[in-house]
């Protein structure tokens, strides 16, 4: 089966490697061609545009940063929508707004193309092993037709329903939880550190309790060492919080903690932490409190 992938960043490159590993004939496109080098070495085939990728594949996955990029890939002059292959199915892995998903799905339908939303949970290491969690909404027949491909990259698959954009709401809600947990853990670490307590002992105690999380277990020990190598950029977390806050208005709700989290991550980006891992919110808090976090990129 010929599968296409547009977007070979941190997540996309590992998803591509996984698809090649399990034997799919993979075509790839990325805005920056050099970022596909390793994938090509592993057997992937480069194409010059999303349109050409659509001509060659029966199923195209898109894994990009934001809604603007996704709409350009789908609806732009060389977009998937202009492919001659009207049997093409498009699966969107990107974390974008529900409204952008609805807009693109409607535009693709006018051209006789089918699509669905499939944002995923799990970082690049999880993607490499094919153990992502997939949250899916949209055309059920298209999903069923490509379920083997989906199962090759996801260990858990949740179908939210046929309404376009539903999966995006769930994804944003999940990322909001991650952002808030990251802030809470960061503030706790800073609090005990300023009290003269070894933060390593605090993390050990925390991880021995019922309240431990995968974040505290996997990220906590790195955070106290100022190790913020990006697996999910702080700037991308801010983008997701902005999407969530923007989507509150049509839902007619107010989520105060989410708004505060957005403001904190915005301030962290303004101080120069955007390209670090989202857990660098701890580094920002140290900076904000007049402490210089050692051994990492400093605020500006």
Identify the role of each PLM range:
Residues 164-288:
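Helical "substrate-binding/catalytic lid" subdomain
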Residues 50-115:
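Rossmann-fold NAD(P) dinucleotide-binding segment
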Residues 95-175:
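Rossmann-fold dinucleotide-binding core
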Residues 26, 46, 115-116, 157, ...:
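Hydrophobic beta-strand scaffold residues
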Residues 1-63, 88, 93, 124, ...:
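NAD(P)+-binding Rossmann beta1-loop-alpha1 motif at the extreme N-terminus of oxidoreductases
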């Amino acid at each position: 089966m010929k599968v296409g992938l547009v977007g070979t960043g941190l997540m996309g490159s590992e998803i591509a490697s996984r698809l090649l590993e399990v034997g799919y004939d993979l075509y790839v496109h990325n805005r920056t061609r050099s970022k596909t080098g390793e994938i090509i070495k592993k057997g992937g085939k480069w194409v010059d545009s999303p349109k050409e990728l659509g001509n060659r594949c029966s199923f195209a996955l898109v894994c990009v940063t934001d809604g603007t990029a996704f709409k350009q890939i789908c609806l732009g002059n060389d977009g998937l929508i202009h492919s001659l292959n009207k049997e093409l199915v498009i699966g969107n892995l990107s974390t974008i707004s529900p409204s952008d998903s609805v807009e693109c799905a409607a535009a693709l339908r006018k051209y006789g193309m089918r699509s669905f939303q499939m944002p995923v949970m799990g970082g690049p290491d999880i993607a490499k092993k094919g153990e992502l969690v997939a949250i899916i909404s949209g055309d059920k027949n298209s999903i069923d037709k490509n379920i083997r491909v989906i199962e090759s990259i996801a260990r858990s698959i949740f179908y939210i329903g046929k309404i376009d954009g539903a999966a995006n709401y769930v994804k944003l809600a999940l990322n909001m939880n991650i952002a808030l947990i990251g802030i809470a853990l960061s503030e706790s670490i800073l609090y005990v550190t300023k009290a003269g307590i070894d933060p390593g002992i605090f993390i050990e105690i925390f991880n021995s309790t019922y309240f431990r999380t995968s974040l505290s277990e996997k990220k906590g020990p790195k955070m106290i060492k100022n190790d913020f190598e990006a697996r999910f950029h702080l700037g991308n977390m801010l983008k997701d919080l902005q999407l969530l806050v923007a989507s509150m208005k049509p839902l007619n709700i107010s989520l105060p903690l989410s708004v505060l989290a957005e403001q904190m991550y915005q301030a962290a980006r303004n101080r120069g932490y955007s390209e670090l891992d989202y857990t660098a919110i701890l580094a920002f808090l140290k900076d904000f409190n007049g402490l210089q976090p050692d051994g990492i990129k400093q605020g500006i």
